[in-house]
From Swiss-Prot:
Organism name: Homo sapiens
Pathway field: Purine metabolism; XMP biosynthesis via de novo pathway; XMP from IMP: step 1/1
Catalytic residues in the record: C331 (thioimidate intermediate), R429 (proton acceptor)
The encoding gene: IMPDH2
Protein name: Inosine-5'-monophosphate dehydrogenase 2
Keyword set, alphabetical order: Acetylation, CBS domain, Cytoplasm, DNA-binding, GMP biosynthesis, Isopeptide bond, Metal-binding, NAD, Nucleus, Oxidoreductase, Phosphoprotein, Potassium, Purine biosynthesis, Repeat, RNA-binding, Ubl conjugation
Family membership: Belongs to the IMPDH/GMPR family.
Numbered residues of crosslink Glycyl lysine isopeptide (Lys-Gly) (interchain with G-Cter in SUMO2): K195, K208, K438
Binding residue positions for K(+): G326, G328, C331, E500, G501, G502
Means of activity regulation: Mycophenolic acid (MPA) is a non-competitive inhibitor that prevents formation of the closed enzyme conformation by binding to the same site as the amobile flap. In contrast, mizoribine monophosphate (MZP) is a competitive inhibitor that induces the closed conformation. MPA is a potent inhibitor of mammalian IMPDHs but a poor inhibitor of the bacterial enzymes. MZP is a more potent inhibitor of bacterial IMPDH. Subject to product inhibition by XMP and NADH. Also inhibited by ADP.
Tagged with keyword RNA-binding: yes
Length: 514
């Protein structure tokens, strides 16, 4: 009975757990599996949790998810899918500058508000020109002007309905013979708002709505497919022109200035300086060059894992920092070069420093599951960059293959000999371009099929929301505020605790995540 007679009353609650400062000031390097977050009080549903996060000083995303600039992870297909689901993708640079810029262009053209530079043909162009345009751009709703250029008089439009049933011998017909004539078109006047134009397009039941000035000259066009995308993807990441956001990676060498120019012309929103060790004079000079030439272009520096590294890049003018060195599943930098830092410690230390300057942090590497994402965000990261977690999705580059009956896709580190042999950009990332003997800092492997991003990312989003609910925070901003104030508590896990926290004591089981 005496055990129940301890004084203090019902208001007494013993201090429990560790603050983030206490957890990470012990001198040990910790990674995501080494600790847990202690739960809080729930008075809201998971779907009320706001995941809005800062990617950079000027770019905000509705979900804190970013795809890595790796040649087996992010090209246009992945970047489009990530932007539609509220994140952003970074096109890799292990390719020619022209290829990379074209991938960015595909993302920026995928969804638009007012399209001010559409494909335009003239009445004297032929049907085969429409099929060529369709093969190149993926659509065939093409306005026809008297000169075949924007800014000249609109005379008609060609749609799939005009050409679907034409025979091969009719492909030499002039477009003026088969196009929908101007008098049969629904158009809107220049100066109309996008909302008003969309309403006209909905009522018209047409595929395209040309926008013309008082002289009947074509100045823009809007598409019904974009209306449907707006409806189907309410979280989509877009710029001021209603185009999808897109990032791209570049290096820090003189040749990368040409690549930068092509990317800027393609409309890239943000560039990440892709280096395994970002605290270099080469990166500092490149940051200053970009900020001088393209002051409105957002620049992400990295990779860094210490406050001292971060300071130099912040002083140079970066808009965000990428944190991680040697923690990726395909990275062997820590093993080979003895440099790096366990990822949880790196994220906390850099985030705690960078927040004083309003610089967001991207946690890059070591993410194996949705719990790791939640932990990275709780340690101060604004967004999380993923490579292996998104590899082998439908939208990732590469073809599927089968091994022992399992459907796989290739996945490799940019420091692997495979990637270095493909293009010089991978060597530049690891300062290896002049080496006679290449020192691999990554490996090549394969990852099991995960299905489409459009199913996988919503699962990740729901998982993060449920994690925030268990913590007792209605937003990621609140999670970070609780962490820095000491309200959010953590606890170290022993190896036995980690075993207990996983699946155990079963003869067999099936682990289905979504």
């Amino acid at each position: 009975m005496a055990d129940y007679l301890i004084s203090g009353g019902t208001s007494y609650v013993p201090d429990d757990g560790l603050t983030a400062q206490q957890l990470f000031n012990c001198g040990d390097g910790l990674t995501y599996n080494d600790f847990l977050i202690l739960p809080g009080y729930i008075d809201f549903t998971a779907d009320q949790v706001d995941l809005t996060s800062a990617l950079t000083k000027k770019i905000t995303l509705k979900t804190p998810l970013v795809s890595s600039p790796m040649d087996t992870v992010t090209e246009a297909g992945m970047a489009i899918a990530m932007a539609l689901t509220g994140g952003i993708g970074f096109i890799h640079h292990n390719c020619t500058p022209e290829f990379q810029a074209n991938e960015v262009r595909k993302v920026k053209k995928y969804e638009q508000g007012f399209i001010t530079d559409p494909v335009v043909l003239s009445p004297k162009d032929r049907v085969r020109d429409v099929f060529e345009a369709k093969a190149r751009h993926g659509f065939c709703g093409i306005p026809i002007t008297d000169t075949g250029r924007m800014g000249s008089r609109l005379v008609g439009i060609i749609s799939s309905r005009d050409i679907d049933f034409l025979k091969e011998e009719e492909h030499d017909c002039f477009l003026e013979e088969i196009m929908t004539k101007r008098e049969d078109l629904v158009v809107a006047p220049a100066g109309i708002t996008l909302k008003e134009a969309n309403e006209i397009l909905q009522r018209s039941k047409k595929g395209k709505l040309p926008i013309v000035n008082e002289d009947d000259e074509l100045v823009a066009i809007i598409a019904r497919t974009d209306l449907k995308k707006n409806r189907d993807y309410p979280l989509a990441s877009k710029d001021a022109k209603k185009q999808l956001l897109c990032g791209a990676a570049i290096g820090t060498h003189e040749d990368d200035k040409y690549r930068l120019d092509l990317l800027a012309q393609a409309g890239v929103d943000v560039v990440v300086l892709d280096s395994s060790q970002g605290n270099s004079i080469f990166q500092i000079n490149m940051i200053k060059y970009i900020k001088d030439k393209y002051p409105n272009l957002q620049v992400i520096g990295g990779n860094v894992v210490t406050a001292a590294q971060a300071k130099n890049l912040i002083d140079a003018g970066v808009d965000a920092l990428r944190v991680g060195m040697g923690s990726g599943s395909i990275c062997i930098t820590q093993e080979v070069l003895a440099c790096g830092r366990p990822q949880a410690t790196a994220v906390y230390k850099v985030s705690e420093y960078a927040r004083r300057f309003g610089v967001p942090v991207i946690a890059d590497g070591g993410i194996q599951n949705v719990g790791h994402i939640a932990k990275a965000l709780a340690l101060g990261a604004s967004t999380v960059m993923m490579g292996s977690l998104l590899a082998a999705t439908t939208e990732a580059p590469g073809e599927y293959f089968f091994s022992d009956g399992i459907r796989l896709k290739k996945y490799r580190g940019m420091g692997s000999l495979d990637a270095m042999d493909k293009h010089l950009s991978s060597q530049n990332r690891y300062f290896s371009e002049a080496d006679k003997i290449k020192v691999a800092q990554g490996v090549s492997g394969a990852v099991q099929d995960k299905g489409s991003i459009h199913k996988f990312v919503p699962y990740l989003i729901a998982g993060i929301q449920h994690s925030c609910q268990d913590i007792g925070a209605k937003s990621l901003t609140q999670v970070r505020a609780m962490m820095y104030s000491g309200e959010l508590k953590f606890e170290k896990r022993t190896s036995s605790a980690q075993v207990e926290g996983g699946v155990h004591s079963l003869h067999s089981y099936e682990k289905r995540l979504f």
